[in-house]
Structure formats: structure tokens, C-alpha cells
A protein has these predicted regions:
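Eukaryotic partner-binding/assembly regions in large regulatory complexes
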Residues: 1-89
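Leucine-rich, amphipathic alpha-helical/linker segments
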Residues: 12-16, 26-29, 33, 85, ...
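Short, leucine-enriched amphipathic alpha-helices that occur as contiguous helical runs
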Residues: 23, 102-103, 123, 152
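Short capping segments at the starts of secondary-structure elements
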Residues: 33-35, 118-121
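Positively charged, polyanion-binding regions of nucleic-acid-associated proteins
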Residues: 89-93, 97-120
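Long, low-complexity intrinsically disordered regions
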Residues: 110, 114, 134-143
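DNA-recognition alpha helix
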Residues: 122-136
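Accessory, usually C-terminal, subdomains that scaffold auxiliary metal cofactors
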Residues: 141-202
């Protein structure tokens, strides 16, 4: 019975969008098997993420670490030293696995737009999507309007940064090809659900 009370969706993603450049630093710390002291030195003292406050830096570091920790060191290496495109898609893959809210939006809403030849998202898409999420997870009904708006902002920004839409204002859908290196990694590591989300435009 307790398992049914576990939220299917959560708002952890509000801490930041893709955070590509920041993810390079976190991947490096993970690859180096850094101690808690090393993390504090890098994130708080040295401010490698270049945030305005220690609280913001720690919040984003926590989010990125949670994302990347779901993947293997092989992906961390792509994040840390890959090209801009490779790093972006590697970070996106981790973000999709970390956030069911992002994953399902891509796999259902955006996929349907491509299948029905609707070339752009609408403001109503997010509202309707959250209603469908609430049917699967009643916890969604407890989210405030501010939280819903922030989640929309972050998800749309992620889609823009990853090249799936041309901007957060126009919301025009763009075709995306998954880089072979990323695709091979996802297949080899049985991340087919993540790959399915990333291949929605194909």
C-alpha cells in the first residue's frame, strides 16, 4: 500500500534547466571520486559553478549530481570532455531519466505534435499535460500555481537548450537527431526509455 503513495512526479527540476557548463564541473568531481571536502571547496569556496550565492550553487550542484549519478562514468566522461553537442545530449539524457515530468512531456505531448503535424507547442499544452499527470499522481494537485509556472519555464527552457524547440516564446518544434555516440551509450546501457524520448522527432 505504501508504494501507491510515492509521487510519480516531483518538482525537483525547478533548481535549473540543462545546466550544461555546470554539469561539466560536476562530472569532473564525480570522475575524480571527490570527497565531501573537495565538493565543498569546489562548489562553495571556489564557486566553480559561478553562482551568486552558496545556496544557489549547492542547489544546482545537488540537482546535477542527482541526474548524473543515475548514469555511468562513461556518460560522465562525455559530459566532462565531449563537444558542445555531445555534452548537451548527454546531460539531456540524464535529465530525462531523473525527471519523469520532463520524460513524459516529451514522450506524449511533443510526440503527438509530431505525429499530428502540429508544428508548435501552445500555452494550453502544459495545462492539459498537468491535468493528465494529476490523474496518474494526485500529488500534482497540491502544486501551487507558482510551482506549475516554474516547472513549465524549466521544461520549455530545457527543450529550447536541447534544440527541440526554437525558443521559449515561439515554441516552434525542431527536428533533432540523436548523436550516434549518445545513442550507442543508451542502447548499450539499456536506457531505451530515455532514447525513446530523445528520438521523438524521428
Amino acid at each position: 500500500m505504501a508504494a501507491t503513495n510515492i509521487p510519480k512526479y516531483n518538482g525537483a527540476i525547478t533548481a535549473g534547466a540543462l545546466l550544461v557548463s555546470e554539469s561539466r564541473h560536476i562530472a569532473r568531481l564525480l570522475l575524480n571520486q571527490s570527497s565531501s571536502g573537495d565538493w565543498h571547496q569546489a562548489i562553495v569556496v571556489d564557486n566553480v559553478l559561478q553562482k551568486r550565492s552558496p545556496a544557489s550553487a549547492k542547489s544546482q550542484a545537488k540537482l546535477i549530481k542527482a541526474r548524473l549519478s543515475l548514469m555511468t562514468p562513461e556518460l560522465w566522461k562525455m559530459v566532462e570532455s565531449g563537444s558542445a553537442d555531445v555534452t548537451t545530449q548527454a546531460v539531456l539524457a540524464a535529465a530525462i531519466k531523473h525527471s519523469r515530468l520532463l520524460a513524459d512531456f516529451m514522450d506524449t505531448v511533443i510526440r503527438q505534435h509530431w505525429q499530428t503535424f502540429v508544428p508548435k507547442l501552445s500555452t494550453r499544452d502544459w495545462t492539459d499535460y498537468l491535468k493528465s499527470c494529476a490523474q496518474l499522481d494526485p500529488h500534482v494537485n497540491q502544486w501551487s500555481d507558482a510551482t506549475r509556472a516554474k516547472l513549465k519555464q524549466i521544461v520549455y527552457l530545457i527543450l529550447s537548450q536541447a534544440g527541440y524547440i526554437d525558443g521559449t516564446r515561439t515554441l516552434k518544434l525542431l527536428p533533432v537527431s540523436v548523436i550516434p555516440e549518445i545513442r550507442a551509450y543508451l542502447i548499450d546501457n539499456n536506457e531505451t526509455d530515455v532514447l525513446r524520448c530523445m528520438e521523438i522527432t524521428q
